[in-house]
Amino acid sequence: MVGYIGNVDIGVFDAEVANSMSAELERQNTLLQMIASENFVSRAVLQAQGSVLTNKYAEGYAGSRYYCGCALVDVVENLAVERLCRLFGCKFANVQPHSGSQANQQVFMALLKPGDTILGMSLDCGGHLTHGAAPNVSGRWFNAVSYGVNRDTGLIDMDEVEALALSAKPSLIIAGASSYPRRIDFAAFRAIADKVGAYLLADIAHYSGLIAGGCYPSPFGHAHVVTSTTHKTLRGPRGAVIMTDDEEIHKKIRLSVFPGMQGGPLMHVIAAKAVAFKEALHPDFKLYAQQVLENSRVLAGVLSSEGLDVVTGGTDSHIVLLDLRSKGVTGREVSSSLERAGIVCNKNAVPFDTEKPWVTSGIRLGSAAETSRGLGVPEFESIGRLVAKVVNACSLGQEKMSAAEAEVRREVNGLVRSLPMSAFPVCEVC
């Protein structure tokens, strides 16, 4: 019999991967994780995702699989669907999409045909690649028209949305964003969609945890269909879901997901989604969402008081977007400097940005992950001052920038040492 290495620990069998995992744990533990699309999952979510369910192939849906031996994974998928519907108060849900981008594509496939017109937010004003950006499938398969924000306020220009909808007659309108910090008026979007006979897709990838926690407007009752990732403010594994109250749309989406765009679902990830949904149904999750919002508003306030340009002047979500043009520095420069100082964020386009996407004129900060770590208002006040110190130093030359980075790094070390992430060990070497 050929020897099987299935019972060998990763630290023994593959030290290179094990060491990388340990190093990544150390990185997450010792730096402030301020990327708005990231969060820290619980030990229970990690246990589900690292379970034996990864061994099971289960093409199809619960009760209608193409493989035998699926009775137990059916239980898991049904739990995920039931919990998700209960969490958002929707009638139908599909928990199989592997990612948010795929979920959006699956909606397009279900409701549109190539060449149809879609109306979504432009990338530089806060939209996502899948909302019609030229390099993306959504911008290549469809006639993509983009709306933006008011140049003075930074808020979505609903008059422009309506004018574009009336002239372009889109088949689908997308309400959602990846770097828009304010509330989205889903009811107003639906009214416009109804005027032109369009479907309304709400992409709540960034806001879903806040919606579940009652801290952000819900699209349900307005949008025909809703997509979300599960790993941002919802604090679950990397993946996505599609929800609707319309049974006919639900049936089309089922076929679009499988067999349209995916084969076997990732049952270990669906199990982790089910666990995350149960966590989000707990009363404590509302407190978490409230703290995420309070922390981001405190952060925005401190940054503004330190003389930095906060896009829209504040936030209604976990996102804080900084426009760096008045400082004469780029998002790439500042995000790199902040990382050296122990604060991890991402460079980001700001409204009407003229820099290249890999340079940008802004940075995006998020409060979700560090709120999960346990940081509150005092810590986020400190983080705001530390970010401002680095940003201001970036325009003063290499020597002052390096000095600021070193000073801030020492303060970050003190913050993270007081609140290590205890949920993370997933193997002996980690």
Swiss-Prot record:
Enzyme Commission identifier(s): 2.1.2.1
Give the Gene3D superfamilies listed for this entry. Aspartate Aminotransferase, domain 1 (3.90.1150.10), Type I PLP-dependent aspartate aminotransferase-like (Major domain) (3.40.640.10)
One Gene Ontology term of the biological-process aspect is: glycine biosynthetic process from serine
Query: Does the entry feature the keyword Cytoplasm, yes or no?
Result: yes
Q: Which residues carry this modification: N6-(pyridoxal phosphate)lysine?
A: 232
Q: In which pathway does it act?
A: One-carbon metabolism; tetrahydrofolate interconversion; Amino-acid biosynthesis; glycine biosynthesis; glycine from L-serine: step 1/1
UniProt GO cellular component terms: cytosol
Query: Which keywords describe this protein according to UniProt?
Result: Amino-acid biosynthesis, Cytoplasm, One-carbon metabolism, Pyridoxal phosphate, Transferase
Listed under catalytic activity are: (6R)-5,10-methylene-5,6,7,8-tetrahydrofolate + glycine + H2O = (6S)-5,6,7,8-tetrahydrofolate + L-serine
Q: Which coenzymes or cofactors are required?
A: pyridoxal 5'-phosphate
Q: What is the superkingdom listed in this entry's lineage?
A: Bacteria
Q: Answer yes or no on keyword Amino-acid biosynthesis.
A: yes
What GO terms are given for molecular function? glycine hydroxymethyltransferase activity; pyridoxal phosphate binding
Q: What does this protein do?
A: Catalyzes the reversible interconversion of serine and glycine with tetrahydrofolate (THF) serving as the one-carbon carrier. This reaction serves as the major source of one-carbon groups required for the biosynthesis of purines, thymidylate, methionine, and other important biomolecules. Also exhibits THF-independent aldolase activity toward beta-hydroxyamino acids, producing glycine and aldehydes, via a retro-aldol mechanism.
Subunit structure comment from the entry: Homodimer.
Which named protein is this?
Serine hydroxymethyltransferase
Q: Which organism is it from?
A: Anaplasma marginale (strain St. Maries)
Its taxonomic placement starts with: Bacteria, Pseudomonadati, Pseudomonadota, Alphaproteobacteria, Rickettsiales
Q: Which gene encodes it?
A: glyA
